[in-house]
């Protein structure tokens, strides 16, 4: 195997025996083969689209397939084998549709023809079509950067789809981009442009999801979230999918089961539509990577809706209480099927299971505050502007992104602690867990940590920056008193980064390490054109951002 799509890749170079994430070489290979087949399917859908034919089946298949290959989403080899077999059938159906239209493609790429139902042969083929099949280091780097951006975009598109919101231009771009990675005629300059265009569509995807979430559940509002526990048995829901938590809250109401959020599901508490549920108790635990201890003490049922699943240790006592749904999977964990059109997912098995469990053990108590998405911050605009003009707020620090296991990520806690009292942190994503429980105080009633929500809610931070640019009458968003010190981990962070670059944001500091998939030449392009930089020591970076 060879995989270097996440920040924790082995030795900062690539995983070759087993993923640091826990995925096996077999699963890594099946993911590579699925990606290869989806590139072939995309060749067919892009050809059909030119004839005015849109395949909703293919659109959904590709989005689902991309999401399944995101870091920490799916570790179940049987699910990938099934998906690969579905790809064969879908490919055949699309070819038949083209033939019906009188179009006969030259099937020179065996991504359009290769087929085997034998897992051993799938594994052999995967070695031929994996990342290292592209020999030129810079071309490979740009193709993977584009691919990871598309994977992150697919996650946001899927969440919007689950709420009934679609934009066919996003499907078209994702498929065009997958085809671009197969073209031998594209130069480094060509692929660089594809990467920047990916950022443009990333903004569209985040805007679509923001519209889907806020149209369905209302605009997030300032909310204090309980981090203690109740007395009833509970279900802990992790991941990002708000439609899943809607279904779960509706089905658990009146059952005597409490619902808690975990990790990136914390921002569900900020939406007005969910506040009516009295059994929606609070948030339990910390960031995704601490789940192996958090889940032990939760005592109840755990539901994964999206990525951020960590394989349980062999000694884990909670493994028989974990369920997956959507893109997620792990061998031995029961999987809840997708909802049928107009229906809901059936969580009755989880509810009955939870009734037999003990209530959660309290591991902390108190409250954390969040809900500072764009509309809520716009309502505070006068207060914020006055604080900036008076000097009460000297600078904003965008510290959005992901958390992870590496010890070096303690940098972000120390950075937040050492920031002067006249600065404010703008955050989104699970990076917040490094500092959202610190007593950092307020500035004139404005909390010094403004949490906009999930990783996709980085869109809110962009909207806030653009609004401030407008209010202050500036020509360039980079003239604002905002610094960007972003932590990344997986592919959704990649699309957020590309979106920021598309919007013209410069001098972003990215840590705790720069991506292994950036070749020296590609990294130089990002440094020279956008001022991308890594992180140093906290004191060095503090001086860099604020001066002596």
From Swiss-Prot:
Location, primary (coarse class): cytoplasm
Homology family: Belongs to the HCP family.
UniProt cofactor note: Binds 1 [4Fe-4S] cluster. Binds 1 hybrid [4Fe-2O-2S] cluster.
Free-text function comment from the UniProt entry: Catalyzes the reduction of hydroxylamine to form NH(3) and H(2)O.
This enzyme's EC code(s): 1.7.99.1
One family name in Pfam for this protein: Prismane
Gene Ontology terms, MF aspect: 4 iron, 4 sulfur cluster binding; hydroxylamine reductase activity; metal ion binding; peroxidase activity
Top EC group: oxidoreductase
Lineage: Bacteria, Pseudomonadati, Bacteroidota, Bacteroidia, Bacteroidales
Acetylation among keywords: no
Gene3D superfamilies: 1.20.1270.20, 3.40.50.2030
Protein's name according to its UniProt entry: Hydroxylamine reductase
Originating organism: Parabacteroides distasonis (strain ATCC 8503 / DSM 20701 / CIP 104284 / JCM 5825 / NCTC 11152)
Entry keyword set: 4Fe-4S, Cytoplasm, Iron, Iron-sulfur, Metal-binding, Oxidoreductase
Cofactor(s) needed by this chain: [4Fe-4S] cluster; hybrid [4Fe-2O-2S] cluster
């Amino acid at each position: 195997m060879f995989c270097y799509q996440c920040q924790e890749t082995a030795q900062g170079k690539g995983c070759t025996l087993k993923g640091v994430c826990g995925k096996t070489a077999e699963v890594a290979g099946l993911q590579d083969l699925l990606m290869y087949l989806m590139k072939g399917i995309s060749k067919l859908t892009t050809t059909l689209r030119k004839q005015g034919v849109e395949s909703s089946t293919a659109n959904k298949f590709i989005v689902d397939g991309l999401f399944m290959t995101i870091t920490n989403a799916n570790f179940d080899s049987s699910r990938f084998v099934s998906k690969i077999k579905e790809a064969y059938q879908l490919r055949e159906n699309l070819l038949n549709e083209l033939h019906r239209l009188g179009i006969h493609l030259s099937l020179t790429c065996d991504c359009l023809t290769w087929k085997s139902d034998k897992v051993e042969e799938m594994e052999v083929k995967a070695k031929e079509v994996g990342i290292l099949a592209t020999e030129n280091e810079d071309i490979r780097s740009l193709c993977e950067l584009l691919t990871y951006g598309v994977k992150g975009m697919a996650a946001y598109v899927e969440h919007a789809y689950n709420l009934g919101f679609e934009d066919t231009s996003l499907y078209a771009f994702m498929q065009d981009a997958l085809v671009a990675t197969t073209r031998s005629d594209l130069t480094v300059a060509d692929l660089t442009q594809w990467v920047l265009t990916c950022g443009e569509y990333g903004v569209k995807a985040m805007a679509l999801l923001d519209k889907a979430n806020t149209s369905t559940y209302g605009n997030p509002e300032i909310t204090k979230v309980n981090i203690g526990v109740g007395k009833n048995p509970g279900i802990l829901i992790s991941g990002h999918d708000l439609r899943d938590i809607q279904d779960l809250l509706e089905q658990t109401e009146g059952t005597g089961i409490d619902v808690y959020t975990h990790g990136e599901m914390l921002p569900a508490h900020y939406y007005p539509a969910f506040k009516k549920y009295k059994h929606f108790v609070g948030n339990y635990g910390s960031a995704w990577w601490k789940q192996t201890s958090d889940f032990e003490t939760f005592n109840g049922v755990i539901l994964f809706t999206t990525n951020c699943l960590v394989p349980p240790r062999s000694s884990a006592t909670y493994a028989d209480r974990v369920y997956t749904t959507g893109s997620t999977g792990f061998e031995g964990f029961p999987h809840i099927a997708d909802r049928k059109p107009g229906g809901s997912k059936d969580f009755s098995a989880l509810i009955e299971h939870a009734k037999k469990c003990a209530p959660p053990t309290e591991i902390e108590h108190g409250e954390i505050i969040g809900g500072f998405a764009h509309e809520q911050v716009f309502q505070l605009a006068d207060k914020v502007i006055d604080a900036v003009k008076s000097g009460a707020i000297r600078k904003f620090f965008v510290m959005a992104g992901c958390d992870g296991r590496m010890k070096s990520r303690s940098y972000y806690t120390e950075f937040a602690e050492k920031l002067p009292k006249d600065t404010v942190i703008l955050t989104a994503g699970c990076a917040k867990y490094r500092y959202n429980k610190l007593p950092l105080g307020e500035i004139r009633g404005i909390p010094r940590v403004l949490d906009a929500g999930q990783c996709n809610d980085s869109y809110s931070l962009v909207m806030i920056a653009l609004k401030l640019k407008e209010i202050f009458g500036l020509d360039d968003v980079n003239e604002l008193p905002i610094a960007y010190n972003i932590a990344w981990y997986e592919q959704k962070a990649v699309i957020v980064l590309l979106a920021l670059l598309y919007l013209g944001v410069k001098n972003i500091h990215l840590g705790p390490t720069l991506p292994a998939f950036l070749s020296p030449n590609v990294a130089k392009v990002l440094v020279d054109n956008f001022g991308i930089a890594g992180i140093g020591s906290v004191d060095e970076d503090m001086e860099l951002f604020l001066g002596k």
